[in-house]
């Protein structure tokens, strides 16, 4: 509500989803209640958790969920839940806006709908802190004829190859490289 986002544009939720009989129903109930304020539509939003692939990664759990969500938006596909056989019987998915991502789900291409494709990512900390962010697909950029030049510098045992994306980036990269080489002669630079 505060961000002015229509919840029906959220097509995927990367849940904290640790696979517990108590925790998962509570999380899905919270998601259902949040959507219910804005839509009565059922089963339009896939829900998954990368923990089915890796288990709980403790402090990195939220970060890996964020990475999965970003890749899902980029690839326009939601990967299926690994090792998923049947839903938790304590979760009434048929009455919820979410459904388990039990199969590869296409998100569609930009422009197919008037709305921007979004996803949510939830992460719960051991101290009781809950975090939820909403991400959206990157805007479609116009293609240009600009092709970056490959910048090469060969000095003794040093090789730097940089493929800038824009003319501005080319200029800034060159300034940075010259400055860095002057400050750290003989060191290898990674960037």
Protein language model features and the residues they cover:
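Condensing-enzyme catalytic core of the thiolase-fold
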Residues: 1-143, 153, 189
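Flexible, low-complexity linker/boundary loops enriched in proline and small hydrophobic residues
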Residues: 121, 134-191
């Amino acid at each position: 509500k505060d961000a002015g986002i229509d919840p029906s544009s959220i097509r995927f939720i990367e849940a904290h989803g640790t696979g517990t009989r108590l925790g998962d129903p509570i999380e899905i109930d919270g998601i259902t209640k949040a959507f219910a304020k804005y839509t009565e539509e059922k089963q339009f939003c896939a829900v998954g958790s990368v923990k089915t692939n890796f288990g709980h990664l403790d402090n990195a759990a939220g970060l890996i969920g964020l990475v999965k969500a970003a890749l899902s938006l980029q690839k326009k596909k939601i990967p299926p839940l690994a090792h998923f056989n049947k839903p938790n019987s304590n979760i009434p998915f048929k009455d919820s806006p979410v459904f388990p991502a039990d199969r590869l789900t296409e998100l569609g291409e930009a422009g197919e709908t008037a709305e921007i494709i979004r996803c949510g990512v939830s992460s719960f900390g051991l101290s009781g802190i809950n975090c939820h962010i909403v991400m959206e697909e990157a805007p479609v950029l116009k293609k240009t004829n600009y092709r970056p030049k490959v910048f090469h510098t060969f000095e003794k045992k040093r090789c730097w190859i940089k493929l800038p994306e824009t003319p501005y980036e080319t200029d800034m990269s060159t300034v940075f490289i010259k400055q860095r080489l002057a400050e750290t002669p003989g060191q290898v630079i990674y960037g």
